[in-house]
């Protein structure tokens, strides 16, 4: 059954490698479960409802990508797009989150049409091979920078934009996080050099265990105001009935005072950012995985773009901002993921 669905032998992989790759991708993008509810709650949405919507939209999108395109690309509400949703459309422009969700829904429908008519595929194939390789390298550097920021190894600075972490000044928060990140990075690199396919996953798990030990010993201290949370697993049960507060609400949007021109501007903003975000991600991740053919084209690209478009509209109906293909999928690809099973 699994072989028939995902063609593991044809792609020179096996179930064990694909599962490890899938877990690796999940671990690298799980941060969205905390970040997305926080960001969209600024638009007036219930954070618990957004958490559930984020999970469901990610599930629908990733399953669509796996079953329609058989690619190891995970989907979830996109960073940047959720910030635009909350702080620009609902914040500066003053529209309700229901109107914003409707814009995302319509964007997804437009994308479905563009995908079925091969317009998005034509744009993807029109990108020169040299640019595709450049995008792949750029995305790698982008992920590395995000990782350094998340690990607090680099922090913002008014003079130089970024600078190194002050280990001594904030030892119990920033400092210990940076040290743990360095330890995890060293472990991951050593395992990767030695050929362990689960190197990234093992590195993440070891770092987490060391983090919990640091918290237990008082070396790492929780400071919610500064964004340093408990590293222990939470046993708190989510109230799943909250999903009713966002599910289908895009169809109840009140357009009084919005104006058709303003709605089109919002729609086009979501449309173009999502289009090139998805294309850039597919180029970078597929290039890293060696999935491009001799003409530097991605086989079955139409199905991949269609899955992404379906996820966008489905996510809006469920109650979250634009659901898109995640560049963190490259971590799973690096762990050996080659099919939708990952």
Ranges and model annotations:
Residues 42-50, 69-74, 163-176, 333-342:
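Short, amphipathic, aromatic/basic-enriched membrane-interface segments that mark the entry/exit
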Residues 61-73, 189-192, 269-277, 308-318:
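Transmembrane alpha-helix interface/packing and boundary motifs in multi-pass membrane proteins
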Residues 59-67, 88-89, 112, 185-190, ...:
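Alpha-helical transmembrane segments of multipass membrane proteins
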Residues 2-36, 57, 78-87, 91-139, ...:
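Helix-loop-helix junctions within the multi-pass membrane cores of secondary transporters/permeases
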Residues 63-77, 190-201, 334-340:
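Membrane-helix interface "capping/anchor" motifs
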Residues 1-49, 165-169, 204-302:
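Helix-loop-helix hairpins and the membrane-proximal interhelical loops
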Residues 46-92:
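Active-site cofactor/substrate anionic-group-binding motifs, chiefly glycine-
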Residues 93-209, 213, 342:
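Membrane-embedded alpha-helical modules
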């Amino acid at each position: 059954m699994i072989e028939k669905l995902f063609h593991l032998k044809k792609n020179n992989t096996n179930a064990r490698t694909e599962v490890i790759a899938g877990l690796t991708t999940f671990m690298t993008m799980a941060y969205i479960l905390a970040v997305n509810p926080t960001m969209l709650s600024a638009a007036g949405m219930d954070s618990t409802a957004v958490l559930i919507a984020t999970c469901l939209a990610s599930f629908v999108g990733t399953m669509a990508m796996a079953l329609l395109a058989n690619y190891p690309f995970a989907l979830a509400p996109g960073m940047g797009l959720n910030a635009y949703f909350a702080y620009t459309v609902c914040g500066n422009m003053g529209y309700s989150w229901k109107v914003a969700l409707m814009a995302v829904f319509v964007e997804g429908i437009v994308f479905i049409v563009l995908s079925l008519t091969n317009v998005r595929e034509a744009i993807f194939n029109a990108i020169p091979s040299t640019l595709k390789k450049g995008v792949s390298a750029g995305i790698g550097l982008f992920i590395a920078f995000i990782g350094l920021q998340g690990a607090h190894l680099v922090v913002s600075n008014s003079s130089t934009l970024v600078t190194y972490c002050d280990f001594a000044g904030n030892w119990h928060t920033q400092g210990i996080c940076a040290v743990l990140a360095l330890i995890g990075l060293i472990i991951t690199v050593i395992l990767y050099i030695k050929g362990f396919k689960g190197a990234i996953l093992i590195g993440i798990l070891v770092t987490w265990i060391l983090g919990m030990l640091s918290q237990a010993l008082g070396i790492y201290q929780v400071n919610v105001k500064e964004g340093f949370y408990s590293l222990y697993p939470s046993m708190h049960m989510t109230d799943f009935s909250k999903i009713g507060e966002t599910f289908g609400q895009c169809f109840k949007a009140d357009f009084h005072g919005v104006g058709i021109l303003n709605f089109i501007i919002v729609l086009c903003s979501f449309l173009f950012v999502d289009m090139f975000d998805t294309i850039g991600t597919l180029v970078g991740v597929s290039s890293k995985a060696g999935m491009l053919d001799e003409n530097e084209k991605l086989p079955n690209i139409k199905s991949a773009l269609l899955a992404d478009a379906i996820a966008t509209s489905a996510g809006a109906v469920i109650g979250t901002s634009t659901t898109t293909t995640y560049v963190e999928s490259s971590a799973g690809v690096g762990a050996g993921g080659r099919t939708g099973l990952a």
